[in-house]
Amino acid sequence: MSKNKNVKETTKGPQAREAVFHPEFREDLRFWVKTDRKVALRVFELIEGVMRMPFEGIGKPEPLKYMLAGAWSRRLTQEHRLVYVVSNDRIEFLQCRYHY
């Protein structure tokens, strides 16, 4: 992982969006790598899915009603969710642990 506060990556394609990983998200991912690698791999699957199709696909994507505007979640486990915000040019990954 990079030492930058927000690690940025780009994808290729007609609607390429930049991926921004917030510090809390990176901390959550480190937790999964240390405690449950299967869940960590699921996080990477969901990231790939979100980057391809932010509003449909695996993990039962659903818009969040009571969080910030444009926030979506996908089911990571029965208890935990991956939360992200989609804008025109980027996808911000906010957290991947706990239920919102």
What do the PLM-derived regions correspond to, one by one?
Residues 1-79, 86-100:
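Basic, Lys/Arg-enriched alpha-helical interface segments
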